[in-house]
């Protein structure tokens, strides 16, 4: 909303959200590489076709789980049972959240994959609304607060923060837009 109507919202929080989809450290966090190896967005279209026009968000969870099979198959359960007296509530809460994925229709997921993951058009201000308004994150006039972590293999810091260097040439450019951006990078969480 802030990228289209600058005066409408207050501070904008971005908790580990990918905004610069092409960013990443070479050889780490292979989600983008995995998508490229599949040959683009045809897998998304096929999956939606097989789902009769629906895309089950469980496929996204499956992709994330495959990033670290050792955690999925061993560590997660080991941690639960090694701390069974204290870990059960946290484990159940996380699994409910993690398994509470969203279902999308074919058009929605195809747009997300083509425009964001492949096109990287949000970070480069190339997305327009149906009304023709350009979504430009530089238009946000509220402070932007970003949280990210080196331990996040789904949204590494480069994807959470890379939009800043995609949109602003340098600190002076950022100041010229009157923007305030505060971010923190945790080492492990």
PLM features: what roles do these ranges have?
Residues 160-171:
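Short, well-ordered amphipathic alpha-helices
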Residues 26, 176-189:
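C-terminal catalytic histidine-bearing segment of alpha/beta-hydrolase fold enzymes
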Residues 154-160:
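Conserved alpha/beta-hydrolase "acid-adjacent" motif
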Residues 140, 146-148, 152:
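Short beta-strand/loop motif that positions the catalytic acidic residue
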Residues 2-110:
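Alpha/beta-hydrolase-fold enzymes
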Residues 4-10, 169-177:
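Secondary-structure transition/capping motifs at alpha-helix termini
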Residues 98-134:
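Mobile cap/lid helix-loop segments that gate and shape the active-site cleft of serine hydrolases
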Residues 1, 152-154:
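Short strand->helix junction
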